[in-house]
Amino acid sequence: MGLSDGEWQLVLNVWGKVEADLAGHGQEVLIRLFKGHPETLEKFDKFKHLKSEDEMKGSEDLKKHGNTVLTALGGILKKKGHQEAELKPLAQSHATKHKIPVKYLEFISDAIAQVLQSKHPGNFAAEAQGAMKKALELFRNDIAAKYKELGFQG
């Protein structure tokens, strides 16, 4: 299920737009995640108290975490499917410490696609959307495999 060179180029092209404002994009992704799937908010002790979108937009901690999430994802995407070294510690922490189910990774993948579509429609046409969907699915499948190795049934 790997991506072609052309598909990776589409993914990295739009990701270049994201990197111009990782914190802003990340904050918007997390807000969409929490609004669309409020149950995910319960996994974040630091953000549980944020109930409204305005509270979320005003949270520097949320913005910082959004930056962290998208920085890590960008590092993985740039590996073009050769992300073993980057995935192992991420899977370890998300399985054993944070206990994040794979389903939640699907939810955040959807939120990422929605943010990219709304902020960068010119760089995120159907072909780029398909490529990003494949890249994020590859990431989730690899995380799920690592979870299984760790004995986490997320």
Swiss-Prot record:
SUPFAM superfamilies: Globin-like
Binding-site list for O2: 65
GO BP, one annotated term: removal of superoxide radicals
Modified residues (Phosphothreonine): 68
Modified residues (Phosphoserine): 4
EC code: 1.7.-.-, 1.11.1.-
Location in or out of the cell: Cytoplasm, Sarcoplasm
Origin: domain of life: Eukaryota
Pfam families reported in the protein's UniProt record: Globin
Keywords, sorted A to Z: Cytoplasm, Heme, Iron, Metal-binding, Muscle protein, Oxidoreductase, Oxygen transport, Phosphoprotein, Transport
Domain Globin: 2-148
Binding-site list for heme b: 94
Gene Ontology molecular function, alphabetical: heme binding; metal ion binding; nitrite reductase activity; oxygen binding; oxygen carrier activity; peroxidase activity
GO cellular component terms, semicolon-separated: extracellular exosome; sarcoplasm
The keyword DNA-binding is annotated on this UniProt entry: no
Residues that, per the record, bind nitrite: 65
Top-level EC class as recorded in UniProt: oxidoreductase
Catalyzed reaction equations: Fe(III)-heme b-[protein] + nitric oxide + H2O = Fe(II)-heme b-[protein] + nitrite + 2 H(+); H2O2 + AH2 = A + 2 H2O
Entry-linked Gene3D superfamilies: 6.10.140.2100, 6.10.140.2110
Role played: Monomeric heme protein which primary function is to store oxygen and facilitate its diffusion within muscle tissues. Reversibly binds oxygen through a pentacoordinated heme iron and enables its timely and efficient release as needed during periods of heightened demand. Depending on the oxidative conditions of tissues and cells, and in addition to its ability to bind oxygen, it also has a nitrite reductase activity whereby it regulates the production of bioactive nitric oxide.
Family: Belongs to the globin family.
Quaternary structure (record): Monomeric.
Protein name, UniProt field: Myoglobin
